[in-house]
Amino acid sequence: MTGYTAHGGFGRLNYSISVPDTAMTQKQMEEKFMGKYTELQREAYEANMQIPAQHLALYTWGNVSAFDKAAGVFAIKPSGVPYPELTPESMVIVDLEGNVVEGKLRPSSDTPTHAVIYREFAVSDGAKIGGIIHTHSTYAVSWAQAVKAVPLFGTTHADHIQTEVPCTPYLSREAVQNDYEKETGNLIVSHFRSLKLNPNEVNMVLVGGHGPFAWGATADKAVYNAAVLEEVSHMAMNTLQINPSQQPLPDYIINKHYMRKHGPNAYYGQK
């Protein structure tokens, strides 16, 4: 033990006390007594609890994961557990091959899809993705069931992405029978690459016949993007009910709204 030693006495009683000169940091204490992935689990838990709070899914119809790129793992909601029963400790730690690293429960059945997106977009392509969400929110699912991209009709949409929200085709019979959830991730990745879409700029997608996935720099930001997707899906549907022949917003308005928030000379908000 390093440190200093104090000596003293009282009458015939002598004592010697050794005091260490180092102390564990708060993070070290948490890792020792609370688990190595405590913070990652907390981030995933808090994001998952936003699904019912933001009305993005009923019952257990959605999941969020939080990614630690340096460690090569992510924390994700356990399969089939109702949101009120979740705790930070119930979040399952999984590696990028889908193997459980820590946790007593089975991870979400959508775990392989999350793993593919992290592996291909965040690791291989270098996209700034720290969280992914999948839900069955009503309006986004409606567009997915129609196998239609969400048109960019207005500035609310353009404030977030400069394109329509892409929708993949259906998975093939072979893909569904082979490895359904993994192939869902592969379909998303191949669809983006075929359209030359940048996952840093287009952070949401619909899977044909299935539903929405969204991602962001953090798990919380992924939830925000999923809420945006649901809202613009609703707005687009209403727009077509009012005017079935409505055309997309002109490019010059799209570019203005997107760049004022995300461009090199962005001026929206407090900086």
Task: Identify what each model region corresponds to.
Residues T2-T5:
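Extreme N-terminal basic, low-complexity initiation segments
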Residues I17-V19, T25, M29-K271:
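Glycine-rich flexible loops
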